[in-house]
């Protein structure tokens, strides 16, 4: 389990564990944005967990890793950290975060690399949503609905709205729809 110490915060974690979470979340990071802070990962340490969040104009995704922490911390980490981690073999990493100057030092066996983080305050906050309708379903039923229409979703960077599945509720049912512009699923 990763550990975090006082002073300059230290996160010890498996390279593959961290890389897997960052790669999952990287799909949400825009290549260009009018809000540059969303081109970063948000690292938050709360209640013994490291939460990693990405956001764009359409939403946000959060993943978490267990850790031991003596205090909470929040910092934005450049997406370029992913490129540095990809080149390393599996090994324990020690990530040192200086909350004062936002410097981030990643040490590994035989080397280190540094990046400069950013204050987390400008990162988009989670929006509070009003629950208008509630339908209960199992994860298996939900996954089944998505798997039936996902093949109809496009993978087109020029029309990102076609790269998704629309989920609507009507009369107590969940309706899953996707389209690539040629077929409807």
Residue ranges of model-derived segments:
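Structural preference for solvent-exposed beta-strand-turn elements
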Residues: 1-185
């Amino acid at each position: 389990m990763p550990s975090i110490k006082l002073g300059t915060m230290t996160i010890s974690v498996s390279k593959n564990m961290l890389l897997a979470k960052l790669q999952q979340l990287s799909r949400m990071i825009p290549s260009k944005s009018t809000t540059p802070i969303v081109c970063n990962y948000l690292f938050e340490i709360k209640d013994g967990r490291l939460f990693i969040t990405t956001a764009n104009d359409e939403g946000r995704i959060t993943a978490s890793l267990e850790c031991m922490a003596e205090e909470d911390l929040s910092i934005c980490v450049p997406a370029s950290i992913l490129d540095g981690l990809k080149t390393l073999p599996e090994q324990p990493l020690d990530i040192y975060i200086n909350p004062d100057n936002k410097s981030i030092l990643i040490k590994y066996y035989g080397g280190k690399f540094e990046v400069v983080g950013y204050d987390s305050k400008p990162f988009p906050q989670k929006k509070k949503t009003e629950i208008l309708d509630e339908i209960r379903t199992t994860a298996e039923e939900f996954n089944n609905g998505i798997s039936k229409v996902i093949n109809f979703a496009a993978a087109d960077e020029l029309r990102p709205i076609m790269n998704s599945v629309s989920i609507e509720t009507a009369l107590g049912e969940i309706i899953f729809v996707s389209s690539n512009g040629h077929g409807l699923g």
